[in-house]
Amino acid sequence: MFKVLPFTAIVHPNAITAPRLVVKMSAIATKNAVESFVVKPPAHPTYDLKGVIQLALSEDAGDIGDVTCKATIPIDMESEAHFLAKEDGIVAGIALAEMIFAEVDPSLKMEWSINDGDKVHKGLKFGKVQGKAHSIVIAERVVLNFMQRMSGIATLTKAMADAAHPATILETRKTAPGLRLVDKWAVLIGGGKNHRMGLFDMVMIKDNHISAAGGVSKALNSVDQYLEQNKLQMGVEVETRTIAEVHEVLEYASQTKTSLTRIMLDNMVVPLSNGDIEVSMLEEAVDLINGRFETEASGNVTLETVHKIGQTGVTYISSGALTHSVKALDISLKIDTELALEVGRRTKRA
């Protein structure tokens, strides 16, 4: 299941001199691990979680590894560290943490009292990792970086998904570069749904496409021709910004066989000076479409406004705030000091 390969970018905790080795899971082992997840990560055609993990470990390790660990921690010291929630929220990233620990040192053992997507309260110890102190400390920051970000996304997603009901909450492509898989996975864990993964899995006709094509109808017609010529089948969404554009889309669809599946209603939620929002334009657009296509509200979506937007009858509500500026959930990983000291004393006596 496992094989040892040379990998110069990642430093194994026990490797002090070159060549450095890292234990890597086989493709079958990776697939089996993913299948066991409570919430499975979304798929991507050109990269996967292994690549994300290896890049994160590589940028941390540099070319010689953790010099502080080598200087301060006996290489054979065994220890135990606990995950502590320092504020209330939804935890996400447990499955990814296990993959990271396994990448650093497959001998590490983990135990959890919760699953991805569960709520934690401040002060709760919800997991522990046991094994070589070197390995735990080397993996610590990478694990926490992912878990804190993912948990922050999942926490906000859960709150917005609950408030948006019966509409479904979606994220956007406004994700951290290189972390789209992870960010979108966190949205799923928090109870949201994924919008398109990238530029390749859905046609999304936005304002710039419409301007370049010469109008909404021309853009839609070009997309229909392109998909037919290339024998492609995928979702098609078009952005509308006014009621007139909604009429134009519906007129086009009534006269032409189209691949259109969803109409985005962009910035049809108007913020008011008193902090409330006006949704009459959005309601009018939803009534016009009358279930012929999926609808997606976008723009001025916050935790405070999403409930009112969700009551208009839209199918989806998309929010870039879920991923582009989310607050990380405060989580720590602390080594059991007494256990470490006792192991250290035994090591010295030996």
UniProtKB/Swiss-Prot annotation:
Keyword flag Chloroplast: no
Reaction catalysed by this enzyme: nicotinate beta-D-ribonucleotide + CO2 + diphosphate = quinolinate + 5-phospho-alpha-D-ribose 1-diphosphate + 2 H(+)
This enzyme's EC code(s): 2.4.2.19
UniProt keyword annotations, A-Z: Alkaloid metabolism, Glycosyltransferase, Pyridine nucleotide biosynthesis, Transferase
Binding site for substrate: 141, 172-174, 196, 206, 239, 266, 298-300, 319-321
Top enzyme class: transferase
Keyword Isomerase: no
Gene Ontology CC: one annotated term: cytoplasm
Transmembrane segments annotated in the record for this chain: none
InterPro entries xref list: Aldolase_TIM (IPR013785), NadC (IPR004393), NadC/ModD (IPR027277), Nicotinate_pribotase-like_C (IPR036068), Quinolinate_PRibosylTase_N_sf (IPR037128), Quinolinate_PRibosylTrfase_C (IPR002638), Quinolinate_PRibosylTrfase_N (IPR022412)
Pathway: Alkaloid biosynthesis; nicotine biosynthesis; Cofactor biosynthesis; NAD(+) biosynthesis; nicotinate D-ribonucleotide from quinolinate: step 1/1
GO biological process: alkaloid metabolic process; NAD biosynthetic process; nicotine biosynthetic process; quinolinate catabolic process
Domain of life, per lineage: Eukaryota
GO molecular function terms noted in the UniProt entry: nicotinate-nucleotide diphosphorylase (carboxylating) activity
Function text: Involved in the biosynthesis of pyridine alkaloid natural products, leading mainly to the production of anabasine, anatabine, nicotine and nornicotine, effective deterrents against herbivores with antiparasitic and pesticide properties (neurotoxins); nornicotine serves as the precursor in the synthesis of the carcinogen compound N'-nitrosonornicotine (NNN). Involved in the catabolism of quinolinic acid (QA).
Membership in a protein family: Belongs to the NadC/ModD family.
Name used for this protein in its record: Quinolinate phosphoribosyltransferase [decarboxylating] 1b
Organism: Nicotiana tabacum
